[in-house]
Amino acid sequence: MLKKSIWILVSVTASISLSVVVGIINPSEKINALWLVVAAACFYVITYRFYASFIAAKVLTIDENRTTPAQKIFDGIDYHPTNRWILFGHHFAAIAGAGPLIGPMLAAQFGYLPGFLWILIGSALGGTVHDTVILFASVRRNGKSLAQIAGDEIGPVGGIAAAFAILFIIIVALAGLGLAVVNALSQSPWGTFTIALTIPIALFMGIYLYRIRPGKVAEMSAIGVILLLFAVFSGHYIPGSFLDPFFNLSKNSLVLSIAIYGFIASVLPVWLLLAPRDYLSTYMKIGTIFLLAVGVIMIAPTIQMPPVTRFAEGGGPIIPGRLFPFMFITIACGAISGFHSLISSGTTPKMLMNERDIPFIGFGAMLVEGFVAVMALIAATILIPGDYFAINSKLSFEALAAIGFPVERISELSEMVKTDVAGRPGGAVSLAVGMASIFSAIPGMKGLMPYWYNFALMFEALFILTTVDAGTRVARFLLQELGGKVYKPLSQTRWLPGNIGASLLVVSAWSYLIYSGNISSIWPMFGVANQLLAAVAFGVGTIVIVKSGKLKYAWVTFIPMVFMFATTLTASYQLIELFRDKASRARSVTDALTFKIDAFLVFFMATLAVIVLIDIAVKFFRYVSGRVEVIRKEIDFRG
């Protein structure tokens, strides 16, 4: 009875909070950011309690008695049984990158309401299912990648198209994520020093847990957190010191440094660097977001951005397209992310100890990421709209005033953080300003705005970099799988020359895109690539569910698949037209060629995705109509 009463109370609280947010209650008043925090927290708790249980028990039929690939194929490099909390930390750190931070910040152009509703509904009913179903499918198939699962489930044509699409998409995605790290750390010695220090700390944690004190997770965690806090606070003393020149890096130097790190993390055994660093980063990620939520609760800031702005109809100074479809591809990982399917069928299934942990890791980590996206949206929308646009666009103050968004406090904000923040597009700077505004408003924190601003930039880089290292490793898996069709030893992950060669090719590809691109070209391509991949993953998940004899539950992936294909193909068409228009108006031959290449890349990604979609549709109707015998591809490992 007590439990039932608690869930009723949580449901009522969620309903009231959502009513305030959407304007049913007090529609004429500006709302308090506290309502967004409460609504999201309650909605996500309810979703995890009921929808996650439904997916695990009815749709997937989790079996905790089955032996997982991590145990059966243990090799100490990629396949390695891992504690559920450490694996949650790795998985969350790997999936939670630039999307939930930068995406909502940029999408705030359309107002706070569309983005908030999409983050809430998209993550709870779409993103969670996407991640959980693909993780389950991979665990049941020896930890196979999404490309291999697609080949097994939908056939060779769709499988090959999916493999090339996924490889191409992940390279573009890694470039987008890497660019966000570069923008956050450029000329920031504090952040660069702290990020660099997490690498030896993670190596020590890995050796401590698996060699010095095997299985002592609590000890390792305590030591790691203490060392991480030292790295964070000691970084404050780097600017202006004799170490400043070593960590005050240009963008090109940062690209090279990140590429070297990504290569090393991709080749080393997963337990040595990747897993402990991701686990360590998760403490900082979740801890900072938790403190940000506490700050919002304590100071209760008012949302300054209108519910819906005039840019919803025809685009604005930050995002050139209208709300549909560009809001959905801009928010990306904050609601639904195809990149997650690469982690859910890459590193995570090879480290899972027990199937019962699948909902906790796949479903739970996505909900936490959704909450991160809500906090990023709040950080954007508590800024005065004119100041928000002044930071995130290159428009003059006069031009912003002419379109109805006068700049009010931009000079004051620049003085408070000791940095000129005007005309700094990309989302990283405005997010840091928003976070610093919340932290410095907490009692006792006044006057620490510059500290919190630099801390926020470091936090963003730490948040995003963990997806770059894990993504590079996953891309290496995929490239080795494809290469193995030509030269068989390449497909063996234990073969070091293959690991090194594939990692080098992957790192070279995404680092080149960062060198040659910018946020205005890479981020829209990243959004389209990411969401096209999500649509493909939903399609593969639908076939997996149908072939498992659960046709009546196929709607959990089929409905999101249809929506994501409709959204991303529309966005692809509009983005191609946008790049073609920019090419026709380019001031130089080089710029025109760049925009034409961008248009071709989007067309190529969309074409591959359509091929996969057609193959999925054909297979789906054949299975449903009974024309083809259903053959399950699961590997039965029972303990």
Could you describe each region identified by the protein language model?
Residues 1-14, 46-101, 282, 321-322, ...:
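Membrane-interface "cap" regions at the ends of multi-pass membrane proteins
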Residues 53-80, 106, 120, 129-158, ...:
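Flexible loop linkers connecting adjacent transmembrane helices
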Residues 29-49, 107-138, 147, 190-202, ...:
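Extracellular loop-to-transmembrane helix junctions
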Residues 43-52, 166, 171-173, 226-231, ...:
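Selective recognition of specific alpha-helical transmembrane segments in multi-pass small-molecule
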